[in-house]
Amino acid sequence: MSRFFRRRKFCRFTAERVTEIDYKDTVTLKNYITESGKIVPSRITGTRAKYQRQLARAIKRARYLALLPYTDLHNK
């Protein structure tokens, strides 16, 4: 029986030695929100708790400043 290979989760911010997550970096922030606009939990992304808190704060600031949408699922 062949089992599928699960990739090991790791914190990108720790690996890149990021000191603080910037709310203006929307390209990075978009990787941590779902299509519906929800923040992806750390148990799925592998982000450490310290950076998950910074990430949530940065996403919320970016939403408030209209850099990121609150939701993308608007019916047309």
UniProtKB/Swiss-Prot annotation:
Protein function: Binds as a heterodimer with protein bS6 to the central domain of the 16S rRNA, where it helps stabilize the platform of the 30S subunit.
Lineage: Bacteria, Pseudomonadati, Pseudomonadota, Gammaproteobacteria, Aeromonadales
Gene this chain is encoded by: rpsR
GO molecular function: small ribosomal subunit rRNA binding; structural constituent of ribosome
PANTHER family in alphabetical order: 30S RIBOSOMAL PROTEIN S18 (PTHR13479), SMALL RIBOSOMAL SUBUNIT PROTEIN BS18M (PTHR13479:SF40)
NCBIfam families (alphabetical): S18 (TIGR00165)
Keyword Nuclease appears in the UniProt entry: no
Gene Ontology CC terms, in alphabetical order: cytosolic small ribosomal subunit
Pfam family, one: Ribosomal_S18
Summary of subunit composition and partner proteins: Part of the 30S ribosomal subunit. Forms a tight heterodimer with protein bS6.
UniProt keyword terms in alphabetical order: Ribonucleoprotein, Ribosomal protein, RNA-binding, rRNA-binding
Cross-referenced Gene3D superfamilies: Ribosomal protein S18
Name this polypeptide is given: Small ribosomal subunit protein bS18
GTP-binding listed as a keyword: no
